[in-house]
């Protein structure tokens, strides 16, 4: 009976060791594959639309200002046909906040 317990403990120890080695090898191979894929990956950032330019093609493409991102506003100009015109603009609240921050920067130093 003692021999059976001894062999079962030995078997479990060897089994856990071998399974850990296999998992470690699998993880290292997966890490190597991921690193090689990341090395081949190219950055594909979209070009942003500058302030006061047309953003009707992509309404989420406006560039960032100093503190916040500009917003694409769409409107219908007066006296023209019913075509919608969109442009990237800075919200008034953000404009005021940037002015306050600029004043604070000049006061503080």
From Swiss-Prot:
Secreted found in the keyword field: yes
Disulphides: 48-63, 55-72, 62-88, 74-86
Domain of life of the source: Eukaryota
InterPro entries linked: Spider_toxin_CSTX_knottin, Spider_toxin_CSTX_Knottin_CS
GO cellular component, one term: extracellular region
Region annotation Knottin domain: where it falls in the sequence: 45-88
Record-annotated membrane-spanning stretches: none
Pfam families: Toxin_35
Signal peptide as annotated in the record: 1-22
One term of GO molecular function: toxin activity
Propeptide, residue positions: 23-44
Biological role stated in the UniProt entry: Enhances the high-affinity desensitization of human P2RX3 purinoceptors.
UniProt family annotation: Belongs to the neurotoxin 19 (CSTX) family. 05 (U4-Lctx) subfamily.
Name of the molecule in the record: U4-lycotoxin-Ls1b
């Amino acid at each position: 009976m003692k021999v059976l317990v001894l062999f079962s403990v030995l078997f479990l120890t060897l089994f856990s060791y071998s399974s850990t080695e296999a998992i470690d090898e699998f993880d290292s191979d997966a890490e190597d594959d991921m690193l090689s894929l990341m090395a081949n990956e190219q950055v594909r950032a979209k070009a942003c639309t500058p302030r006061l330019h047309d953003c009707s093609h992509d309404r989420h493409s406006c560039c960032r200002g100093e503190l916040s991102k500009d917003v694409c506003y769409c409107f219908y100009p007066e006296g023209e046909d019913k075509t919608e015109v969109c442009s990237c603009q800075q919200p008034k609240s953000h404009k005021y906040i940037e002015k306050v921050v600029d004043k604070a920067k000049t006061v503080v130093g």
